[in-house]
């Protein structure tokens, strides 16, 4: 095994090699530092990186290995943390210049759990300001490029995390998802991203502890690694009053087994609007995999209307405004994005009646969803209406000139599942003719996270993607 290919090992492979003493955390760290130095300047995925600290941490993990101490399930495996999540002693900037000196005084629960499992913290990844849209650019660190097509969007808001995984900057990345922020960039970067059921992973991103729409999620290159990372991060914690007990069976074990007879509903757009014909064609081709696996496929779409207005006025706008209302927004022009300031002013125009109506719509949507899923086990769709598009473009070109809400939401097939709190995963479905990744989304009912992972793992078995990597000529300057 050489340093030249260590960075493409899965987390599962790395952990097994460390456990069998065929690989040391020191070797992993050296390979990863070289990879970050070579690739990150081109894509700007990791924005806080301390190579000396990585080396020191790896040395301690190697000492434990050499001493024959009990090793954790991620011993020596690199992971990154999104810059919305607290890491003790490092800035939690939210991608905002006014927060550049906001030094965390403790770790988020997920950071403690990943480190406690022996994981090697590699650095913090880029995010748009406050994680507010489906791309990754900000006034503090600049844009993150898609490793498959430089100059194009990596998606967001976990764009740095997804780009890092896609480019071989560690097999595991923590993301967070409030309207698709794990699944959007994972789809655009050709990796696996899971939004679990609300409460499976305790959230400490939002000050509002009873918010139930934004949660941490694992981003990986393989489904097995996704299940492994979820096993580490899952479980209740007093920091999150909505967190729930762990499943009795590990997600790694529960994701095994076939899907013969699985009732699959296929929807080309979830009833939400236009889909790029090439994206739809890639997803339709991928859908044939479920027939090969013995699943039963029916084209069907939940009749829940258009939930984007309720997502906007009932969740997104008031949620962001309440999280960041201490900043003096008008005096931050030029320091933060003008569109984010517009969202804050939009919140000032909302009334309690607006928010209440949106919440009522969400309840009706839940009823529609649960009734619909009485006939199906999973609902499969494109993850997004488009493959990646140029940086600094909010949305696909067909939404140019549309309202801010439409540009932010109307190309996403992800946010309904934040409103419903159920699990949804995106997996690589294939590529457009010019080599841009396309994602396929698999969703299931509340607390059926293991089923989502098992379905994704079976799909991966017949449509493998781990050997498909962006060319170094694209990502190395």
Curated annotation (Swiss-Prot):
Pfam families linked: Amidase
Domain of life: Bacteria
Record's function text: Amidase with broad substrate specificity, catalyzing the hydrolysis of a wide range of N-substituted amides, and, to a lesser extent, the hydrolysis of non-substituted amides. Acid para-nitroanilides (4'-nitroacetanilide, Gly-pNA, Ala-pNA, Leu-pNA) are the best substrates for this enzyme.
pH dependence of activity: Optimum pH is 7-8. At low pH values the enzyme is rapidly inactivated, whereas in basic medium inactivation is rather slow.
EC number of this enzyme: 3.5.1.13, 3.5.1.14, 3.5.1.4
Keyword Hydrolase belongs to the record: yes
Name of the protein in its database record: Acylamidase
Activity regulation, short description: Amidase activity is completely suppressed by inhibitors of serine proteases (phenylmethylsulfonyl fluoride and diisopropyl fluorophosphate), partially inhibited by copper and mercury ions, but is not affected by inhibitors of aliphatic amidases (acetaldehyde and nitrophenyl disulfides) or by EDTA.
Temperature dependence: Optimum temperature is 55 degrees Celsius. Shows a drastic decrease in activity above the optimal temperature. Is stable for 15 hours at 22 degrees Celsius and for 0.5 hour at 45 degrees Celsius.
Gene name linked to the record: aam
Top EC class of this enzyme: hydrolase
